[in-house]
């Protein structure tokens, strides 16, 4: 067996033993040894492989798998292929999503020589990876490689650090890159690292506390709000926008005199959507407690930064929550806001699709108008760095990981940016993903920012950037179905999501 084949097979074996069940593979020559090994491992039933042409899109598919609770490996060939996954790596870092990058490389003697498709890939992702290392050509295909892979997967999942995120193994291969024969994988010996239990930090909170639940906060935010009798300001992707304590239009309430009476803020997850919340968290007279494992005190005023929390002592004010609920009064929505509200409600029904929400103006419509009920949708978004790129690819990854249909709601620019992620190879499994495009002809978010004061031609060209895009023709070219509906035509929300669908909703 040639050395490259031996390392590739041992690498795949070690990934599976460490618990990796999903791999996104981008075809190339230098990563071919891993490709052959993956094909044999998939035939043996060890894992699932998803082949994608575009590395940028592939990175976000892998990110979506990680968001779905299925840490995935992402395999690329050398050169610019590696650079193209950088956006997904940065999002995984900021959002704390496991992502295991395996980049194939030329051997070190070919670096800095002008060799084809060769650049310095070591450290290409800067400080983003939780672990980054080279596997040089000739590295032994033995227990040392197993241990390295286990370290990488453990770092990615945050099993020991409580800080999941991307890792990078740069694997160099010398010729020959083709195996001598097929691989027949043998029985596996699972190798896992158990996480260290972390005792919750007991907190003593004053009566006039509010709970802010940002992206990924989970159900703990709701539980703490209920225990304390506190208002819950929960973003749509917090996982806690549900129950009697949660407010709908908390941004408007934060503009009232109530905010002057706030004594403390308990922050869970990663809040990014609301300037009123940011102003509240920046107040020096308010005690801010955040549970993030990474430092996220943007304003620099947090009194406590901790891990898991529990309430040790609670001062209660029976009227406190009622005052906030009374101030949370309905606002007349626009057609776009009304549609976001209705989509949210439709995704709370049994067997509803997973909801993936695009960045920019769309998620802010959900944030102001998604009414908390008894059940919250499974709602996800890329809020680590809040870019519009890769949203559709992320949704596809979420669907592959959960095995559930996905409804992804985006603006027209977000759709244009990532529509190519709907392209699917003839041999690849068909995802059930419905892309709802709220088409208001450009970047509507800028109309609500200070840039709205720019001269109309400047605003239109430099910020709104409307596109001439035939979404129906593009969808059909990529193999997806397409339909155009009015904002009041909600029938599509009652129909099953099967295959790749694009639903365009003109708003202008």
UniProtKB/Swiss-Prot annotation:
Obligatory cofactor(s): Mg(2+); Mn(2+); thiamine diphosphate
UniProt KW keywords: Magnesium, Manganese, Menaquinone biosynthesis, Metal-binding, Thiamine pyrophosphate, Transferase
Pathway: Quinol/quinone metabolism; 1,4-dihydroxy-2-naphthoate biosynthesis; 1,4-dihydroxy-2-naphthoate from chorismate: step 2/7; Quinol/quinone metabolism; menaquinone biosynthesis
GO biological process, one term: menaquinone biosynthetic process
Protein's job: Catalyzes the thiamine diphosphate-dependent decarboxylation of 2-oxoglutarate and the subsequent addition of the resulting succinic semialdehyde-thiamine pyrophosphate anion to isochorismate to yield 2-succinyl-5-enolpyruvyl-6-hydroxy-3-cyclohexene-1-carboxylate (SEPHCHC).
Quaternary data: Homodimer.
PANTHER family: 2-SUCCINYL-5-ENOLPYRUVYL-6-HYDROXY-3-CYCLOHEXENE-1-CARBOXYLATE SYNTHASE, PROTEIN PHYLLO, CHLOROPLASTIC
Protein name: 2-succinyl-5-enolpyruvyl-6-hydroxy-3-cyclohexene-1-carboxylate synthase
Gene from which this protein is expressed: menD
């Amino acid at each position: 067996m040639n050395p490259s084949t031996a390392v590739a097979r041992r690498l795949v074996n070690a990934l599976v033993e460490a618990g990796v069940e999903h791999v996104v593979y981008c075809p190339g020559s230098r990563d071919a040894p891993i490709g052959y090994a993956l094909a044999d491992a998939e035939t043996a039933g060890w894992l699932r492989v998803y082949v994608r042409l575009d590395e940028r899109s592939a990175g976000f598919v892998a990110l979506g798998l990680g968001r779905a609770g299925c840490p995935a490996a992402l395999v690329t060939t050398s050169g610019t292929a590696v650079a193209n996954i950088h956006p997904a790596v940065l999002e995984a870092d900021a959002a704390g999503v496991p992502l295991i990058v395996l980049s194939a490389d030329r051997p070190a003697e070919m670096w800095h020589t002008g060799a084809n498709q060769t650049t310095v890939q070591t450290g290409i992702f800067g400080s983003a990876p939780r672990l980054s290392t080279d596997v040089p050509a000739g590295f032994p295909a033995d227990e040392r490689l197993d241990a390295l892979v286990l370290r990488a997967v453990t770092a990615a999942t945050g099993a020991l650090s409580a800080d999941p995120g991307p890792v990078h193994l740069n694997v160099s291969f010398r010729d020959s890159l083709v195996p001598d024969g097929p691989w027949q994988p043998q029985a596996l010996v699972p190798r896992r690292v158990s996480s260290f239990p972390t005792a919750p930090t007991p907190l003593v909170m004053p009566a006039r506390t509010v709970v802010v639940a940002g992206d990924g906060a989970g159900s703990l935010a709701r539980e703490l709000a209920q225990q304390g009798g506190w208002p819950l300001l929960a973003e749509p992707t917090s996982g806690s926008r549900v129950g009697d304590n949660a407010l709908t239009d908390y941004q408007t309430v934060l503009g009232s005199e109530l905010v002057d009476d706030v004594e403390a803020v308990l922050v869970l997850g990663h809040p990014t959507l609301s300037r009123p919340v940011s102003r509240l968290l920046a107040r020096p007279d308010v005690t801010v407690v955040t549970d993030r494992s990474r430092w996220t005190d943007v304003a620099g005023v947090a009194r406590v930064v901790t891990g898991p929390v529990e309430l040790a002592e609670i001062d209660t004010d029976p009227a406190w929550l009622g005052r906030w609920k009374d101030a949370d009064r309905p606002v007349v929505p626009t057609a776009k806001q009304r549609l976001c509200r209705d989509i949210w409600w439709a995704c709370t029904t049994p067997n509803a699709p997973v909801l993936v929400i695009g960045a920019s103006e769309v998620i802010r419509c959900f944030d102001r108008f998604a009414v908390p009920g008894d059940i919250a949708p499974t709602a996800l978004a890329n809020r680590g760095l809040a870019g519009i790129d890769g949203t559709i690819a992320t949704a596809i990854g979420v669907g592959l990981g959960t095995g559930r249909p996905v409804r992804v709601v985006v603006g027209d620019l977000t759709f244009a940016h990532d529509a190519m992620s709907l392209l699917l190879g003839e041999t690849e499994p068909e995802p059930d993903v419905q892309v709802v495009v709220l088409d208001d002809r450009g970047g509507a978010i800028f109309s609500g920012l200070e840039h709205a004061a720019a001269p109309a031609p400047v605003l239109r060209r430099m910020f709104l950037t409307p596109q001439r895009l035939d979404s129906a023709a593009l969808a059909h070219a990529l193999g997806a179905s397409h339909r155009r509906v009015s904002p009041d035509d909600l029938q599509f929300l009652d129909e099953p999501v099967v295959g790749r669908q694009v639903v365009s909703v003109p708003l202008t």
